[in-house]
């Protein structure tokens, strides 16, 4: 009898615990979603807004609107429906791209069998989230041109401070009359780590394109494969961007079916971009977006208002280090092994104008701020011949002095009209 009397209190405790867990799951999901949207907006690249939100114990639903911070050529309307559980929340929804009238006219008709749907899961205890999206094949047609995309998939996972993205594309084909460009499979892997408000952040990206084929009636060009690596870091003092391009083989089968045209790699790093100025520019962009009309592009005169901040980004004398240019051309019998650096003179920045770069005189003033040097090691004889140097010259020293190029102490000859 005593045990029977305990059943009701135990069931009541279990029911209360379940209700509390459900409520906690709903609250934590909402907090995680809000934090993720704030983190996305803190990057300074996106405008994010919630057009609808209904939170409940068992389910929540809503819709989001994402668009580029600069301009409004397109936007993404994302809806979600969340089913809360004690340990996790399952989420699903739709993803609908919208184009502005000008871009819609330029793109033309889009043929897709259904609205893209996505699925995801939020783990209540760890705060880890994952999202999966698979696009049905679609075709865009305009004035005889056609873009055919097949096998597009995306996976996004992570938690506050650390997000990973993986995008897969089986094949993309662009047809314009008798010309055709085909590429794929394509894999993009990205990792983004940051602290609150993206004061410091780092992002690594790796794009791998297994095969590219360009077909013209007269000839074909094939590239296999291409890898692009990038690493961007914003720390206390500076923004650094490092990149590497690796090209496997470029072939022209109609001209030389057995011999590659070229292959190689290029590595470079841009550094000394003032960190505080970068953060201030991002804040100003977010302010401009907040003040403007969500349906319209950025207000006129934006570049003029940002000019001071943009010039401050250059205040630490940025430098571009080209650490490796290694290119080999079996078909032409040429090889390049070069490295060097360029430096920007940041003194008297108030004498420069970003707005005036469209004028030749202003562009000349900017070029005068650039100095640097490059060395082409073990250069072929034909390169010395092109540059008007003695045929026995094996090392080419390129100097940039106030924007003017010299080679081995001589003025750079005019290589083309």
PLM features: residue spans?
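Glycine-rich, small/hydroxylated-residue low-complexity segments
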Residues: 5-12, 16-417
């Amino acid at each position: 009898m005593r045990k029977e009397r305990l059943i009701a209190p135990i069931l009541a405790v279990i029911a209360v615990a379940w209700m509390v867990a459900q409520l906690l799951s709903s609250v934590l999901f909402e907090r995680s979603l809000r934090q993720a949207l704030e983190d996305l907006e803190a990057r300074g690249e996106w405008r994010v807004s919630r057009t609808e939100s209904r939170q409940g114990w068992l389910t929540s639903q809503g819709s989001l609107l994402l668009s580029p911070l600069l301009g409004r050529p397109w936007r993404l309307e994302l809806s979600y429906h969340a089913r809360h559980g004690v340990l996790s929340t399952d989420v699903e929804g739709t993803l609908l791209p919208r184009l502005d009238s000008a871009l819609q006219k330029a793109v033309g008709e889009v043929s897709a069998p259904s609205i893209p749907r996505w699925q995801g899961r939020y783990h209540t205890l760890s705060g880890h989230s994952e999202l999966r999206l698979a696009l049905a094949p679609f075709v865009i047609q305009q004035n005889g041109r056609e873009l055919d995309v097949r096998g597009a998939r995306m996976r996004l996972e992570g938690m506050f401070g650390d997000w990973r993205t993986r995008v897969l594309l089986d094949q993309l084909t662009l047809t314009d009359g008798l010309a055709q460009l085909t590429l794929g499979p394509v894999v993009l892997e990205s990792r983004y780590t940051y602290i609150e408000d993206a004061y410091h952040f780092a992002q690594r990206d790796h794009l791998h394109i297994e095969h590219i084929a360009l077909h013209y009636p007269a000839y074909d060009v094939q590239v296999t494969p291409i890898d692009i690596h990038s690493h961007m870091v914003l720390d206390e003092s500076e923004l650094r961007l490092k990149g590497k391009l690796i090209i496997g083989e470029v072939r022209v089968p109609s001209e030389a079916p057995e011999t590659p045209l070229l292959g190689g790699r290029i590595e470079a790093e841009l550094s000394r971009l003032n960190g505080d100025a970068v953060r201030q520019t991002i804040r100003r962009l977010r302010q401009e977006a907040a003040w403007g009309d969500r349906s319209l592009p950025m207000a006129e005169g934006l570049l003029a208002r940002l000019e001071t901040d943009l010039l401050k980004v250059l205040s630490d004398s940025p430098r571009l280090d080209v650490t490796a240019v290694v290119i080999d051309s079996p078909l032409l019998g040429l090889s390049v092994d070069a490295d060097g650096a360029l430096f920007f003179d940041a003194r008297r920045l108030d004498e420069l104008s970003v707005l005036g770069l469209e004028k030749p005189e202003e562009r000349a003033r900017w070029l005068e701020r650039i100095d640097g040097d490059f060395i082409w090691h073990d250069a072929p004889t034909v390169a010395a011949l092109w540059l008007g140097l003695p045929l026995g010259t094996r090392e080419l020293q390129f100097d940039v002095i106030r924007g003017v190029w010299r080679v081995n102490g001589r003025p750079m000859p005019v290589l083309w009209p």
